[in-house]
Amino acid sequence: MKTVHIEVIHEGEHCIPCVYMALVVEEVAKDYGDALTWEKVIITKKEGALRFDELAQKHGGLPPVPSIYIDGELVFDMTPGPDILREVLDRMMQPKHDSKEKF
């Protein structure tokens, strides 16, 4: 099984949609143990702002806030339910049969 890294683009605890998105990721991450790492990219802090800028340059536009990047790619620009996130992660962790598969 492939290991994946999730980044939650997060404005801060005052952003209720950001908080909810992080809670969904935190809940789901428990199911995957060492196969999944995740972090909040808090854009109001220097380190998070730098990563936000990297993602913006890589993808040619500002990332949505909140959003979920998996292995550096925008996967969700709205908060998914836990079951939907699990389904996408399960597919992403399997050996790829079709490199053009979209989620």
Predicted ranges, named:
Residues E11-C15, I42-I43, V75:
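Short histidine/acidic/glycine/proline-rich micro-motifs that form metal-
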Residues M1-V4, H97, E101-F103:
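N-terminal leader/targeting and pre-domain segments
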Residues I6, W38-K40:
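Generic structural signal for residues in well-ordered beta-strands
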Residues I70-K100:
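Non-catalytic, surface beta->alpha helical segment in thiol-disulfide oxidoreductase systems
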Residues V19-L23, L50, P80:
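Generic recognition of short, well-ordered alpha-helical segments
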Residues S67:
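Conserved beta-strand/loop subsegment of P-loop NTPase cores
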Residues V41-P63:
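Thioredoxin-like thiol-disulfide oxidoreductase module
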Residues M1-Y32:
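Local sequence-structure signature of Cys/Sec-based thiol-disulfide redox active-site neighborhoods
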